[in-house]
């Protein structure tokens, strides 16, 4: 089972891929998203998004600044104000 993850800035699509899990730095604390997660929206604070490509894999960290995260039946979309790298 996999989660569709998209990371977008106002300027471009940074990532669009199938992953195992993503941990997002929400303003109310970090939250993890797996496939089938209940729909919700959250604001994102400056920090690292951790992308786990498979169960048990070491995470890849992507530094982001601000934005919003939306979990829907389609997966997780993060609209970040800025992505480093």
Swiss-Prot record:
This is ATP synthase epsilon chain. Produces ATP from ADP in the presence of a proton gradient across the membrane. The keyword Ion transport applies. Belongs to the ATPase epsilon chain family. It comes from the Bacteria. It is found in: Cell inner membrane. Keywords: ATP synthesis, Cell inner membrane, Cell membrane, CF(1), Hydrogen ion transport, Ion transport, Membrane, Transport. One of its GO terms (molecular function) is ATP binding. InterPro entries: ATP_synth_F1_dsu/esu, ATP_synth_F1_dsu/esu_N, ATPsynth_dsu/esu_N. The lineage of its organism: Bacteria, Pseudomonadati, Pseudomonadota, Alphaproteobacteria, Sphingomonadales.
């Amino acid at each position: 089972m996999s989660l569709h993850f998209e990371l977008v800035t106002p300027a471009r699509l940074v990532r669009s891929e199938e992953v195992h899990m993503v941990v997002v730095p929400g303003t109310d604390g970090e939250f993890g998203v797996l496939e089938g997660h209940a729909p919700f929206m959250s604001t994102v604070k400056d920090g690292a998004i951790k992308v786990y490509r498979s169960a048990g894999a070491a995470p890849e960290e992507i530094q982001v600044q601000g934005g919003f995260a939306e979990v829907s039946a389609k997966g997780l979309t993060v609209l970040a104000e800025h992505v480093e790298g």
